[in-house]
Amino acid sequence: MKNHCLSLTVILAAAAMLIQTASAQSGLPSLPAATKADMEVVYTTAIENRTTDILKLLDLTDPAKSNVVHDIIMAQYRALRTRDEAIDARLKADGKEITFTNRADLLLAQSKPLHEQFLAKLAVILTPEQIEKVKTQMTYNKVAVTYDAYCAIVPGLTDADKAKILELLKQAREEAIDGGNAPEKSAIFQKYKDQINSYLDAHGHDTTKAFKDWEAKNATAGTAPAR
């Protein structure tokens, strides 16, 4: 299945179109078309909420410092949107479908300076532990959730196995904080989970069997990470 990695702006625009269509089909008066300014308000509200959630985890007591961190994170979200729009425009000009696979190389190349500048700005104000919390929240705590899942699903993991799993998941997180949306972040983590599975299979484990056994025991739970 292909991962369609649309920007948040495009997703919101599509939602607006669906509302318009539903209104027309119901026979009710059509809602006015969402303007670019309307979409910008919705987008700003979305990233403001995300940023607020991150700030809550940091326990910053200095309002001035909190405001600076707020502005850094907001600016990063906007920079990622601008990057995504440029990548999508380039793919469209080249006649390519906007998928994670097609975006991957461009994403890595164009994300590097944004990534480095973002973390450098945070490092001036925040401790390493606080920066870890920012990364964790920007990637929906996927490192801890996925690590715990592997420990629960794959029997007989050694300390070395667990260390390797954590190492690869943190690499995934480092790349995923630059993801433009949740599906893109998930696709990045999936790439690293594939590496984890290959590593474990090469070190005496059978991840395919482990996942099947887990799924059989938890048919309706849906707690196992994607293979």
What are these model-predicted stretches?
Residues 25-227:
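Charge-rich (acidic/polar
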Residues 20-24:
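Sec/Tat signal peptide C-region and signal peptidase I cleavage site
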Residues 1-9:
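Bacterial N-terminal signal peptides that target proteins for export
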Residues 9-18:
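Bacterial N-terminal signal peptides
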